[in-house]
């Protein structure tokens, strides 16, 4: 597992449940806990199906070294994901259906990763389902309010923001993917075309943030909340720009982490800005959340991998 990446699913869950308004502390912590853990269990599950390419790109991992048994990984990840879905379904039974859908997506992801036109989008819809599950668990509703500007923007940011993370992540595995017949976008069309596609994803994830914030500002939304949201939004945009500039300079797989790291920063920060619009009292907790992420990222054992 790469625990620093659990912050990606964690902030996705935070954004989803931020639409609920007032919640008990227990409910808030339970939803946060299972969304936070879901990345680790989901990653463990998908890793079981792509040992071939991971053995070349990440030979230091326990699974690729054979230190841990694949079947044990499958059991632990499946039980963990079942627990996460059960908690979210407890707060809203509709999440049982979405959980089954997400589980199917995780189990079949490797098949679609091999296709250049599918990988990032296929991964993104699974994460988007996690956002929707957190939304349903927090609000208790049976429908999605697409007329809510913040909610609609959240869908775009989660989908394209995560798609950009997936695509930039492919840049560190190009040689391994080529050798194992994973026809990802960088393998099929090269780094230059893939970088341009990444630029589009980055723009698609960034524009909705400012459209939402400034639309609310001109609609007499409390300026104190707007300012808090902008702290995260501007930092997120800066990280996005840094991501794209670095990605354009990547010429080897070993250099890709220079773009992947800020891409994760941008995802966490952009989602935090929208969560603040829904719940400004989470400003300090989200700063603490981000600082914890920085600490775990700093002490990760393999600096070239993320």
Where are these regions (language model features)?
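Multi-pass alpha-helical membrane architecture of UbiA-family
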Residues: 1-306
């Amino acid at each position: 597992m790469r625990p620093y990446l659990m912050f990606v699913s964690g902030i996705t869950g935070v954004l989803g449940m931020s639409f609920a308004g007032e919640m008990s502390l227990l409910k808030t912590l339970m939803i946060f806990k299972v969304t936070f853990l879901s990345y680790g269990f989901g990653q463990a599950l998908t890793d079981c199906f792509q040992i071939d390419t991971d053995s070349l790109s990440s030979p230091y991992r326990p699974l690729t070294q054979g230190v841990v048994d694949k079947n044990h990984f499958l059991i632990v990840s499946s039980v963990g994901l079942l627990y996460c879905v059960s908690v979210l379904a407890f707060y809203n039974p509709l999440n049982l259906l979405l959980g089954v859908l997400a589980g199917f997506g995780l189990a079949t992801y490797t098949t679609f990763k091999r296709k250049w036109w599918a990988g990032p989008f296929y991964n993104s819809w699974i994460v988007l389902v996690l956002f929707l599950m957190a939304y349903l668990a927090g609000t208790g509703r049976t429908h999605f309010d697409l007329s809510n500007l913040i909610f609609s923007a959240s869908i775009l940011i989660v989908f394209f923001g995560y798609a950009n993370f997936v695509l930039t992540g492919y840049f560190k595995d190009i040689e391994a993917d080529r050798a194992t017949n994973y026809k990802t976008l960088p393998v099929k069309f090269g780094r230059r075309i893939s970088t341009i596609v990444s630029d589009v994803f980055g723009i698609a994830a960034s524009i909705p943030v400012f459209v939402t914030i400034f639309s609310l500002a001109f609609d007499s939304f409390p300026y104190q909340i707007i300012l808090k949201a902008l702290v995260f939004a501007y930092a997120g945009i800066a990280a996005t720009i840094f991501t794209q500039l670095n990605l354009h300079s990547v010429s080897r797989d070993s250099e890709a982490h220079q773009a992947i790291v800020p891409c994760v920063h941008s995802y966490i920060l952009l989602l935090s800005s929208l969560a603040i619009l829904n719940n400004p009292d989470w400003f300090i907790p989200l700063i603490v959340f981000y600082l914890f992420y920085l600490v775990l990222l700093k002490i990760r054992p393999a600096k070239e991998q993320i």
